Structure formats: C-alpha cells, structure tokens
Amino acid sequence: SIRTKVYQWNGKTVPPQNNFCTNASDLLFEKSDAMGSFRFHEWLICEVETDDGIIGIGNAALAPQLVKKTIDTYLTPLVLGEDPFDYSYIWEKMYRRTHAWGRRGLGMVAISAIDIALWDIMGKITNKPVFKLLGGRTKEKIPVYASKLYSQPIKDLQKEAESYVKQGFKMFKMRFGWGPKDGPEGMKKNIELAEAVREVIGYDTDLMMECYM
C-alpha cells in the first residue's frame, strides 16, 4: 500500500525580510517577497508498505498538497504490485506515464518521494545503509562547507563567517540578496557582501555564491 500525509507547521515562523536571498522567480519587472520560495510550512510524508509489512519512507517539501494528489491519483496505481527491487523499472514507468505533464517540477517531486521510499525499503530488507546500495564509499573523507551566510548587515554577516572559521571550516557558501530586478546597484551590494566575507575568511579558502537562479 502507499499512504501520503501532509504535515503542517503552525508554530512561530521567521517574518519576511527584504533581500534575504534571491528568488528563483525574481523577474526584472516584478517586486516580490524575497523569502517567498523558502517557506516550507508543509511537508509531505510518503509511506510505501510491502506485503511483508516493511515500510519505506519518502518525503517532499515542494508543493506537498499537489504532490499528494499526484501520488494518490496517478502514481500509486502504477506502483502497487511491483517488486521494490525493480526500482529502475518502476521509476521509468512513473516517468513515462507522466511525460505529458511531468518530466520536471511537480511530476519529478512526486516520483522522487516514492523512489526514496523504495530505496528505504531495500535498505531495510538487506539490512544495509542505502549508500551501500548506491555504490558504497568512494573516498575516505568528504570535504564539507559552511552553508548559510544569508544577506544581512555586514557586521552581522562577518560575525557569522568568523564563527565558521573558528569551527575549522575552509569552504563557505553565502547567498546573494539582490537579483535581476535590483539591477546593477543590486549586484554592487552582492559584491560588497562577498568582499566583507572574504575579509574574514581570507583568500586561501573557497567561497561559493548561491543565486537561486
């Protein structure tokens, strides 16, 4: 069986903040809330249960109400009765049956929720971590980076960057706060923030810029 449920957060949330980060829907002619795409107040959980009672769990954060409808109406009939270890066939089946309206966005999010649950099932049946099923370890260590540094007053941004340096990070990712609609002046502000972070982390480190474009 396949069960879906959308959980909703009704507690305290961060109020909208201008230029918090750029928005993928940021257009030259549109003034919009810079945090609009980042309010994950709802979350979908997808449970796929085998005939033996083993439950795999998948999830989706983007448009969960629509993803639920997609899974319940279109994908569940395609998956029921299949062997979870035939995951490649199941994926292709879901993808090809939804190609007229899927192939990206909502369709792929829904397919992914089920696919994650299938991998969870396979991990539980084989009693192995899923990364082992996906090919296993390829290196002894994986470099990590500090990923936050959203647009904020320079002093606060530098203080945050300094805290990551003290933790030993050598790689960092920050966010641009001004997008296409802000024009050249907005890009200048992005550069100012990047320079401010560089002053703290030095030039022997890696600094990435997230534009959400």
Positions of predicted regions on the chain:
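Structured beta-strand/loop patches that form or line metal/cofactor-binding pockets in enzymes
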Residues: 1-52, 57, 61
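Metal- or metallocofactor-binding catalytic centers and their adjacent structured scaffolds
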Residues: 33-34, 49-125
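Solvent-exposed alpha-helices and their adjacent loops that cap or buttress functional pockets
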Residues: 37-39, 136-138, 199-201
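Conserved active-site and cofactor/substrate-binding residues in soluble primary-metabolism enzymes
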Residues: 40-41, 66, 70, 85, ...
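Ligand-binding pocket scaffold of soluble enzyme catalytic domains
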Residues: 46, 86, 125, 155, ...
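Flexible, glycine/charged-enriched surface loops at secondary-structure junctions
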Residues: 87, 130-133, 175, 204
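Glycine-rich, aromatic-flanked loop segments that form ligand/cofactor-binding clefts
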Residues: 106, 115-151, 155-156
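Metal-dependent enolase-superfamily TIM-barrel catalytic cores that perform enediolate-based chemistry
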Residues: 141-213
